[in-house]
């Protein structure tokens, strides 16, 4: 049995009932086989893989809070501090009913590599709760956030662990969390990112992940003598990542014809009117189906199936495992040439393999959606220097980081004779940096 297989079997045996975490570890270990086989003796001796797949720390806690009817509710809170070899733990907080330890370990594990690719000194972590902010009043969300931070504040800090937002955690939640941290610790420091602009936030942070997806797509297309000009694009989701991916793709000359939310999808052959989407999702917090009522010539379809619409570029920006094998086969049959992940692991393993084997150029989320965490790290830099950069400065730094990520992952893939295999390239480039740092710091 190979070293990677041994480590994977051990992960499955020691972490039963955690399929998302198993999937993330398997994908990474499989793609790193060429590097691991080359350095197997040294890695075994130092137990590099065994240490890499085991979080440094998992914090689990109860979160009691009182709802508007005066009833006490109890949720579970978590923080997975996965790897700090290259810097303080960095990764989002997710508030969603589906949150459990497996999902957070998968996200935290992926975060190690994504953060490594940014070239910035940040380690990997993730946290959250099974609390659902949907349908809750502002007071209930505040009560929950304050209770959650009352425990979490013992384990985080500007040089220790710097959480950010994720699904269910936007500007409102970050504000409540930060206020409670400051109140308890009496410290005004960059302990959270995604903050409001009036209290230490960074310009472009909201747009960063979506913009970054399109910047790296643009680099990929340029490298293949192509451009976004005149291309038909589908973007799944309708949250921050999706909205700003649509905005940047449109600015670069593409026509985005479809978006969706968890209920269904809209198709607008004339190109999505982003002002209407922003009004529905950001102002009214409504459902995407309202778009079809407001924009002539557009249609709304209940349920899944957005991939049946013809496109040149498909950007999955909604949630994990949203894009399966049959969907990718349909995309290929309809002439799709590029799939660039905006969400975390939105494409299943078999769908990813099919795309790459059948000539679709595929960029994995750990590379393509790293713009968000990169800009979070830029927010940390601004906080520690007590500075605030202009939108143009932050956008330029983001653009350069995404260019740099593309060149790193394509170079790593070519070095191992796997040109255009960006899944392998991303994992190798990220892994090598983390391992070098782990080796230098001894057995810790």
Task: List where the protein language model places each region.
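Rossmann-like adenosine-cofactor binding region
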Residues: 264-362, 367
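Phosphate-interaction motifs
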Residues: 59, 64-122, 126, 130
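Structured beta-strand/loop patches that form or line metal/cofactor-binding pockets in enzymes
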Residues: 41-71
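Flexible, glycine/charged-enriched surface loops at secondary-structure junctions
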Residues: 19-22, 38-45, 119, 156-165, ...
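Adenosine-phosphate binding glycine-rich loop
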Residues: 2-24, 220-221, 332-444
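Glycine/serine-rich phosphate-binding loop and adjoining beta1-alpha1 elements at the start
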Residues: 96, 115-229
């Amino acid at each position: 049995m190979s070293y990677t297989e041994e480590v994977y079997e051990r992960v499955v045996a020691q972490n039963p009932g955690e399929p998302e975490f198993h999937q993330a570890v398997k994908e990474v270990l499989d793609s790193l086989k060429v590097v691991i086989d080359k350095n197997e003796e040294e890695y075994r001796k130092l137990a590099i893989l065994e240490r890499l797949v085991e979080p440094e720390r998992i914090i689990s806690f109860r979160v009691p809070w009182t709802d508007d009817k005066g009833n006490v509710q109890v949720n579970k809170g978590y923080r997975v501090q996965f790897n700090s070899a290259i810097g303080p733990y960095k990764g989002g907080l997710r508030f969603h009913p589906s949150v459990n330890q497996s999902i957070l370990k998968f996200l935290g594990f992926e975060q190690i590599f994504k953060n490594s690719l940014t070239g910035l000194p940040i380690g990997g972590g993730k946290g959250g709760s099974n609390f659902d902010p949907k349908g809750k009043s502002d007071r209930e969300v505040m009560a929950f956030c304050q209770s959650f931070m009352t425990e979490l504040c013992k384990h985080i800090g500007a040089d220790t662990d710097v959480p950010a937002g994720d699904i269910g955690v936007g500007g409102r939640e970050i504000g409540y969390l930060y206020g409670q941290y400051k109140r308890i610790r009496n410290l005004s420091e960059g302990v959270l990112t995604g903050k409001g602009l009036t209290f230490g936030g960074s310009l472009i942070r909201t747009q960063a992940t979506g913009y970054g997806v399109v910047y790296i797509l643009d680099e990929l297309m340029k490298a293949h003598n192509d451009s976004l000009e005149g291309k038909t694009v589908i973007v799944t989701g309708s949250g921050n990542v999706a909205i700003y991916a649509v905005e940047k793709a449109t600015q670069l000359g593409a026509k985005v014809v479809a978006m969706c939310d968890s209920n269904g999808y809209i198709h607008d052959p004339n190109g999505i009117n982003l002002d209407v989407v922003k009004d529905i999702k950001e102002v009214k917090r409504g459902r995407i189906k309202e778009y079809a009522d407001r924009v002539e010539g557009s249609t709304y379809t209940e349920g899944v199936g957005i991939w049946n619409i013809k496109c040149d570029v498909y950007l999955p920006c909604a949630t994990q495992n949203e894009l399966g094998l049959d969907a990718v086969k349909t995309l290929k049959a309809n002439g799709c040439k590029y799939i660039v992940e905006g969400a975390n692991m939105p494409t299943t393993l078999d769908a990813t393999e099919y795309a790459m084997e059948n000539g679709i150029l595929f960029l994995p989320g750990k590379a393509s959606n790293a713009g968000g965490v990169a800009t979070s790290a830029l927010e940390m830099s601004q906080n520690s220097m007590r500075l605030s950069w202009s939108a143009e400065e932050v956008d330029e730094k983001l653009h350069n980081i995404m260019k740099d990520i593309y060149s790193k992952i394509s170079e790593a893939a070519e070095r191992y004779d796997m040109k255009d295999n960006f899944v392998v390239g991303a994992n190798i480039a990220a892994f090598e940096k983390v391992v070098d740092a782990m080796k230098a710091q001894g057995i810790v």
